[in-house]
Amino acid sequence: MSKKKATSSDVAKRAGVSQATVSMVLNKKYNVSFSRETVEKVEQAARELGYHLPGRKNRKESRKEKLIVVFCPTLTSPYYVLLLQGIEAVANKQGYGVFICNTQRDPRLEEKYLRMMGTIEPLGIIYCCNPNPDFQQQVEELAQTIPLVIISNKEKTTTIDAINQDNTVVGRMMARHLLDLGHRDVAFITPPLTRRQWQRTKRVNGFVKEFEKEGLKDHVIIKAADEAIDMQIPRMDSEYSMGYELTMELLDEGREFTAIAGQNDMMAIGALDALHEARIHVPKDVSVIGCDNIFYSGIRKISLTTIDHFVALKGRDACDIILHKIDEQDRFLTDSAPVSLYNIEYTPKLIARRTTGSVSYTHLRAHETSAHLV
């Protein structure tokens, strides 16, 4: 004999409340005030009895589309393409669509997309980088009502789920590799070091601190692109061009260095081409290191030394967190789901290839001679 299907009357008896209260609580009619104790009793009774409102579907089923929104600052960077591939791989496997909001690092666009969230009603939101500081509070409030993950730098404290990266550690790793190879005069090329892009500054600071530890702080040249660049719509070759042009500027200025560190791999590849054009041999004359370990870096003719911080896996993890939070919400009929905060971080790894090497004897002799003359 089949088990009798539970009714709202059964739930009311189990919870010790009226049927009307059961109906209003499970329908989330919170214009009527109920104590947290009453809400939890009704919810627990409904779960124990396996009761569902007639025709009720969970949030995922009640939507025509299962949608996750991704805020991305640019679609021209291989780094962000890797992140998106990781996100979409997980989302598509679970039947979710991904809607990308390309903010182009423009606060006006970011604000516009944030306003649209109430209309779009996605099931989850992923920020591929830190929100603009002007919208941080708004994003934190949004995270109270919808699963939201930020792929960010660890040194900003937040109450939002995050896939973190300590860029200070990454910068230190880049510097330590060059120091261990004997490099003492180096240059760090980077996109604009703006208030919004403070994670870039963290990487630079980590790099400088490692040299400072060896008493070589003044031996690091920081070459940053003009802030106006971040206000332009990025081209496909924006980061490559920045790396090329900043390296050419260093050469034109006659600056002394035996190694160049690029904020990312595309900038480092731009530096490689500039050095090649100037007939400077890599790594015999100048070593080059990047960061991100994108596909191009492993191509045999490039073979760029870089730092791998597992970009695609970060995208996968961010989407996994979103899906877990959605499922967690759907197991509860009210807002009394347990509160959990996810914080995932990978340990970065040095990938030593052919663009870095020990300082040549000629460079060491020149350095010693100049130091003696001083």
Q: Where are these predicted regions, by residue range?
A:
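An alpha-beta-alpha
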Residues: 174-216, 336-355
